[in-house]
């Protein structure tokens, strides 16, 4: 979970009131944050958050903004945001190469002017950038942010798919390296190059003088990409693979810079062919969030309350959320810096926090029952212990993912997969029907760790099943992956034999026709005439799709079917 260290004096100055450490601790409670101590020598407060839904709070500026809104009714407003059909005047352009659509497609930015950066401000900005990129940005994979002295940049900026041999001086060095050499030699390249190393070309930011601004998401240029105390005019950009996540990160940054005292000047991003987007250009910061409908009866039913619409709207306003009614329906309008309203229940949570947890009377459960583990869970735990005993490391994955990862890279069709009809992002468009793609994706970013690799997961999968009322079936599967230069079919067959020996289950093997195995090196597992899974060596074609260059063998079985025949 995110942890912050913020200067107490800056924090209190931004709130506009003085508080003791105990009072600060109480101020943080509604926002799932804990006061973790005060260092008198540095003057810093330590704060730890208990969830990751509100990246806008991960700076003293964002926290102060929310505290002022919640406790003192000061609703922030930012007039530099463009909206659909209402683009603001822009002061620079970013031109996006069409080839970037398949690499790291999104980049948005703004200019911040009019304030001289001191040492505390610089430290604050660097910490904010790091928290946003590491946590919300999933260690720069999802989004990454760069900050530059704009006086050294000539617009327009070009965001191109560059040759790996392109050279520039990276930040922290005094000699040129090619992009490929940065990946292999620079500390940041070694840490983050796995994000883009599987592409033939790499992202590069160039200004109109053809000077390198940045190699996102790896490292800035040493000549342009270094902020210093005394700088006044900044260019801030965010690149990413997720449209809304990239825009939100930029919006949060713009609001923080504005609250710090900067003037925010919009920048236009122009997407060139063959981008398949609903728009060809966007002036940012841009308000993209959608309104969410809520129902008063649903709120009162879930909270056990009797709140009026007026009271609900006041509670939402304490959270920085505006609301309105139209045609007998009620809607919330998310703030510029938030995008965590995915469903009506998220609105209800904000109402609950706005009301204050102490305003709800605790109730004892109306029913009492003695709990115990289900037979499936007991069996799964036994299997889990066996896997750990054989030297495997357990993984935990999301059940949802993209068509590219679950289907295209696996070289299979989508007939068994469940597709979400209204996905928020293509990264969560399908529900998995197999755990193997998750294991391969982990392997694709683990090449820096010593071999062999042995990982597994016991988790849910969902398949299309027209014989059921719902049209789907959900199962618990066990899957594991082994990788290494010496890993072969015989090696994994030995592990499979050991597993079923200790489970006291007899199995039969038949040659598998599964398309992601090497021909002749895959087997289906049959028990009492029923196919419950299989194992084999992954084909080089599929390995290449995931950017894996070491042999891998995988195994997957349906634990529900396995248990019923044990």
Swiss-Prot record:
Give the catalysed reaction(s), semicolon-separated.
tRNA(Phe) + L-phenylalanine + ATP = L-phenylalanyl-tRNA(Phe) + AMP + diphosphate + H(+)
Where it sits in the cell: the answer is: Cytoplasm
- GO CC annotations? phenylalanine-tRNA ligase complex
**Signal peptide segment:** none
Single GO MF annotation: ATP binding
Print the keywords alphabetically.
Aminoacyl-tRNA synthetase, ATP-binding, Cytoplasm, Ligase, Magnesium, Metal-binding, Nucleotide-binding, Protein biosynthesis
Q: Which family does it belong to?
A: Belongs to the phenylalanyl-tRNA synthetase beta subunit family. Type 2 subfamily.
What is this protein's name? Phenylalanine--tRNA ligase beta subunit
> What lineage does UniProt assign to this protein's organism?
Bacteria, Pseudomonadati, Spirochaetota, Spirochaetia, Spirochaetales
